[in-house]
C-alpha cells in the first residue's frame, strides 16, 4: 500500500471524526516527528459492490460514505480491516460467514484485497440476535452462556428455527450434540432470512 502511495499519517482523535465520513483533514498535512499517529489508506472514487450469499447485492461508495480509513492504529496495532484481509488470504479462506453487523464494513476489506491483489472470498452475513431495543446480544447486555441455561437444547432449536432451518420435531428429545449434527447435515443457506437482526426472547440475554 505504501509503494502505491496510498498511506498517510493521521493525527485526528476518534472524538473529532466519530460518526461521519473522514474528510481528509490530514491528507496533505506534513508529518509531525515524535507524535503518535494512526495510518490511513486513501480511498478512490467509485463504488465497491459484492453479492452476499444471504443478504444479496450490497454496494458502497467508500470515498463518500466512509472516507479514508485507518489501517494501523495509533497504538501500533493493525486495524481489523487490514488484518482480516491479509490473514484470510494467507490461510486460503474461501467463504466467510459472520454477523450482519459487519456487512457495512466488508467493502473496506474488499478494497484492501483489490489493492493488495488478494482473492476476495464469498461472504454470508447472518442476521444477529438482538434485544427488543435492537442491541446485539452480548456480555454487555448480560447475555447468558447457552450451556448455563436449564435447557440449552431449547435455545439451539429456537435459533435454528429463527434462521429458517425448520428443525425436526424429533429434536425436542435430542441432546446438544445431536441437534448440532442435524443442523450441519440439513443446513440450507437459502432459507436464512434476508434481514439484519432477529429479536431473541428476553430470558436468553437477561438474568433478571
Which residue ranges define each predicted feature?
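Alpha-helix boundary recognition
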Residues: 2-3, 161
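Polyanion-binding catalytic cores of nucleic-acid enzymes and NTP/SAM-utilizing transferases
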Residues: 146-150, 155-208
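Active-site cores that bind ATP or allylic diphosphates and position pyrophosphate for catalysis
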Residues: 3, 9-148, 167, 194, ...
Amino acid at each position: 500500500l505504501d509503494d502505491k502511495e496510498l498511506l498517510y499519517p493521521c493525527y485526528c482523535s476518534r472524538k473529532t471524526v466519530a460518526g461521519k465520513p473522514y474528510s481528509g483533514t490530514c491528507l496533505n498535512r506534513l508529518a509531525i516527528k515524535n507524535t503518535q499517529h494512526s495510518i490511513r489508506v486513501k480511498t478512490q472514487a467509485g463504488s465497491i459492490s459484492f453479492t452476499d450469499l444471504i443478504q444479496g447485492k450490497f454496494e458502497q461508495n467508500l470515498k463518500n460514505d466512509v472516507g479514508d480509513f485507518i489501517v494501523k492504529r495509533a497504538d501500533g496495532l493493525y486495524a481489523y480491516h487490514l488484518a482480516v484481509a491479509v490473514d484470510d488470504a494467507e490461510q486460503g479462506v474461501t467463504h466467510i460467514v459472520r454477523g450482519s453487523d459487519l456487512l457495512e464494513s466488508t467493502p473496506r476489506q474488499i478494497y484492501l484485497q483489490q489493492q493488495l491483489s488478494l482473492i476476495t472470498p464469498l461472504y454470508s452475513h447472518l442476521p444477529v440476535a438482538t434485544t427488543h431495543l435492537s442491541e446485539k446480544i452480548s456480555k454487555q447486555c448480560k447475555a447468558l452462556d447457552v450451556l448455563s441455561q436449564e435447557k440449552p437444547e431449547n435455545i439451539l432449536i429456537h435459533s435454528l428455527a429463527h434462521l429458517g432451518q425448520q428443525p425436526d420435531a424429533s429434536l425436542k428429545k435430542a441432546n446438544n450434540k445431536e441437534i448440532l449434527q442435524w443442523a450441519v447435515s440439513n443446513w440450507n443457506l437459502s432459507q436464512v432470512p434476508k434481514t439484519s437482526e432477529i429479536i431473541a426472547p428476553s430470558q436468553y440475554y437477561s438474568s433478571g
